[in-house]
Curated annotation (Swiss-Prot):
Component of the acetyl coenzyme A carboxylase (ACC) complex. First, biotin carboxylase catalyzes the carboxylation of biotin on its carrier protein (BCCP) and then the CO(2) group is transferred by the carboxyltransferase to acetyl-CoA to form malonyl-CoA. Residues 38-292 form the CoA carboxyltransferase C-terminal domain. This is Acetyl-coenzyme A carboxylase carboxyl transferase subunit alpha. It comes from Bacillus licheniformis (strain ATCC 14580 / DSM 13 / JCM 2505 / CCUG 7422 / NBRC 12200 / NCIMB 9375 / NCTC 10341 / NRRL NRS-1264 / Gibson 46). GO terms for molecular function: acetyl-CoA carboxylase activity; ATP binding; carboxyl- or carbamoyltransferase activity.
């Protein structure tokens, strides 16, 4: 099977065996239906066991799957009347970030997201989903427009990180990201951000200062990649698997730490297995979050967002007196 991941090999091998038996029965007079039924039941149990007990590194692999749905895939399935806007009005148009105006269940919204490619040619065009400063400035332009016209903002996060090249630094990469963080904190409309793949460092956070931060079940959100963390901590990028477990970068871990608000269920095996069904899960989550946020006024939205990010990283400890009474 194309795009199989390392931990999926037992599932793939069993699927192939079932497929071979089915083909054999079609080409012969032998009835192997009983054996096929038993193998299919075994496959169901195997899939259930593997996909309900995924390790952090398994989720990293799923988040990086080449066929994983992108921002534009979800825009196609979730929104109507999408009109893409281009350019930052300073330098140019960065195709690593897409954004525009659309309708979600009839409600006018602004949609913004990082966009990866699905093949080499498109990845080069999209800079592998790593935005330049003009991408973040385009995103901010659309956010301010949404604020002016009272449209909720929905952001899709899917990037390894902001592009670290010389030209990007010369054009003010860090300033562009910092400006987004500052401006997003004060937006007077509901902001919902969803991590749909990899959420890497400040490049992800520049679309992540939201009233609600959601993650797909098999996405990741971290300050650095597992390979980068392993290289820094243990001088060996080969220990990325260990780093992934240690860093707590998966959706279940981050929900437990109160970094994110909600984990969106994924199709078994990953979102790439059924884009339409995955979009339906996201649709339901967005509907619920928007319903609650639209009840808040401008000041409540800003205060809620402020309180959310003020509390991140808070540590609670209980001190026990051990001295002389």
């Amino acid at each position: 099977m194309a795009g199989e991941l390392e931990f999926e090999k037992p599932v793939v091998e069993l699927r192939e065996k079932i497929s071979e038996l089915k083909k054999f029965t079609q080409d012969s007079d032998m009835d192997l239906s009983s054996e096929i039924t038993k193998l299919e039941a075994r496959l169901e149990r195997l899939e259930e066991d593997i996909y309900t007990n995924l390790k952090a590194w398994d989720r990293v692999q799923i988040a990086r799957h080449p066929n994983r749905p992108t921002t534009l895939d979800y825009i196609e399935h979730l929104f109507t009347d999408f009109f893409e806007c281009h350019g930052d009005r300073y330098f140019g148009d960065d195709e690593a970030i897409v954004g525009g105006i659309a309708k979600f269940r009839g409600l006018p919204v602004t949609v913004i997201g990082q966009q990866r490619g699905k093949d080499t040619k498109e990845n080069i065009r999209r800079n592998f989903g790593m935005p330049h400063p003009e991408g973040y400035r385009k995103a901010l332009r659309l956010m301010k427009q949404a604020d002016k016209f009272n449209r909720p903002i929905i952001c899709f996060i899917d990037t390894k990180g902001a592009y670290p090249g010389k030209a990007a630094e010369e054009r003010g990469q860090s300033e562009a990201i910092a400006k987004n963080l500052f401006e997003m904190a004060g937006l007077s409309v509901p902001v919902i951000s969803i991590v749909i793949g990899e959420g890497g460092s400040g490049g992800a956070l520049a679309l992540g200062v939201a009233n609600r931060l959601l993650m797909l079940e098999n996405s990741t959100y971290s300050v650095i990649s597992p390979e980068g963390a392993a290289a820094i901590l243990w001088k060996d990028s080969g220990l990325a698997k260990k780093a992934a477990e240690t860093m707590k970068i998966t959706a279940p871990d981050l929900k437990e730490l109160d970094i994110i608000d909600h984990v969106i269920k994924e199709v078994r095996g990953g979102a790439h297995r059924d884009v339409e069904q995955q979009a339906a899960y996201i649709d339901e989550a967005l509907k619920g979050e928007l319903k609650s946020l639209l009840k808040l006024d401008k000041n409540e939205l800003i205060q809620q967002r402020y309180n959310k990010y003020k509390s991140i990283g808070k540590i609670s400890t209980e001190n026990q007196y051990v001295g002389i009474k």
